[in-house]
Amino acid sequence: MATFSYFQNYPHSLLDPLLFPTPHSSINLTSFIDQNHLYPLPNISTVEDISFLEYNVDKTENSGSEKLANTTKTATTGSSSCDQLSHGPSAITNTGKTRGRKARNSNNSKEGVEGRKSKKQKRGSKEEPPTDYIHVRARRGQATDSHSLAERVRREKISERMRTLQNLVPGCDKVTGKALMLDEIINYVQTLQTQVEFLSMKLTSISPVVYDFGSDLDGLILQSEMGSPEVGTSFTNAMPTTTPIFPSLLDNSVVPTHAQVQEEGEERENFVDRSGFNNNNFCSFP
């Protein structure tokens, strides 16, 4: 086997020209032998050793190439593993971030949907008025709550009364503003008060004259009743009854005579002259 392997590895040997002569070469065996071209064949053991060594060399070369391939593979795997180790935390963090973002987006989407639903429900509840609720459209400064409706009614009543006062006072319709309107009403009431006081003073000054005139009328009415009862009754029905403002100074039971009436008339004229009243002053008002 060793020789066979040797011949396989080294097919061309020194015996090739002897065993396989070419047509171009004509070799003389005797001359060849004489020239001592023949060499001794190598020993079989040496051939086996050489072939075994060469086989071992081939094996070692093959194993070296395999080792190199394995080392390259391990290097590539090691580099890839190193890359994975080097980029592993960042990749893990990136995946964690993406997952967190997805979770946040899902939570936000859920919260947004829930918020929208709650808003829609609130709007629906606001749009649907309760059964016992009275919708009141209020202006600025007016109450709209149910507990303030009584206050609103009270303010409306006050405003109506202010309008009636404004209509009573002349020239107050043109005034704008509650303060100015109240000032106009106060001034008007004060003027009315002064006029009433002045008239009451005039009446107190001429009250005796008015009373005497009333007593004269009563005497005439009594005389007419005594003379003609029918005329007296008709006259009393036609004339209004006068009530004295102040207590009587004379006795009503006494019927005045003609002389007494004349004396009373003269006294009345003298009193009017002394007081300075006349018909124009009596009827004049401020």
Curated annotation (Swiss-Prot):
Short name of one Pfam family: HLH
Region described as Disordered: spans on this chain: 63-149
Polar residues compositional bias, start-end: 63-84
UniProt keyword terms in alphabetical order: DNA-binding, Nucleus, Transcription, Transcription regulation
GO cellular component term, pick one: nucleus
Domain bHLH, residue spans: 142-192
GO annotation (BP), single: cellular response to cytokinin stimulus
UniProt subcellular location: Nucleus
UniProt keyword annotation of Transcription regulation present: yes
A molecular-function term among this protein's GO annotations: DNA binding
Presence of the UniProt keyword Amino-acid biosynthesis in the record: no
Assembly description: Homodimer.
PANTHER family: STEROL REGULATORY ELEMENT-BINDING PROTEIN (PTHR12565), TRANSCRIPTION FACTOR BHLH137 (PTHR12565:SF431)
Protein name (record): Transcription factor bHLH137
Gene name in the database record: BHLH137
